[in-house]
Amino acid sequence: KVDKFQGDNRLEVHRIAGDGNGADDFGFGTIKFKDFGIQLDFYLLEDPFPTKIEILFRASIDLFFYQLIVNPVNGAGKKNIARWYKREGEDRGTWTEYIEHRAELPIPVETKAWYTLSILGRGSNFELYIKRKEEASSKKVCAWRDPKNLHPGGVMGIHTNQLQHYHIDNVKIYDKPTEVELNVESHEKLAAIWAN
């Protein structure tokens, strides 16, 4: 089974078979959106190897979607990095990475720790933020634009394949990206004047 809810209502994503392209390797939500904010907590496991998380957005069950993959610092392949993909239907050959939008994560993302991930979408513009769950402020990972706006609307989803095992909790989907609470710290200090 791809996923199951734990007693504490966390979603456990665990796939022990499959090639990553079958119907059981994808999970799709039901609420469609255009502009959006997605915020969720995630916890990567080591079972038996460090895993990654794969989130789909503006997705459809016909396999049209954008995809975010976050690899941990102790994972296989590209380490401590966010990668963006797109897919345009059943043809697996259309599942390609936006290599120019790869971004190193501003904090070390490790297995066996909780993180909060936020994806914002306004038209064809996207932003990614991350923080350790216990931290007050998110850090911006990157911003990018799809000039073709391949997928103007869809649902949230997940993708998994062999050896992926992680938990998701506190999933929130907002109609407006500005509703997501990021508490991002400014890189510039502002002067304040107090009046009597």
What spans do the regions from the language model cover?
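Extracellular glycan-recognition surfaces and repeat-rich motifs
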Residues: 1-22
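Secretory/extracellular carbohydrate-interaction modules
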Residues: 15-92
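Beta-strand-rich interaction surfaces with strong enrichment in secreted/lumenal proteins
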Residues: 24-31, 102-109, 157-158
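Short tryptophan-centered beta-strand motifs in secreted/extracellular beta-sheet-rich domains
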Residues: 38-40, 112-130
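Surface-exposed loop/edge segments in extracytoplasmic proteins
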Residues: 63-65, 92-98, 134-143
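Short, aromatic/His-centered strand-loop micro-motif at the edge of beta-sheets
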Residues: 90-118
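Short, solvent-exposed beta-strand-to-loop segments that form ligand-recognition rims
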Residues: 129-155
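Ligand-recognition surfaces built from glycine- and aromatic
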Residues: 147-195
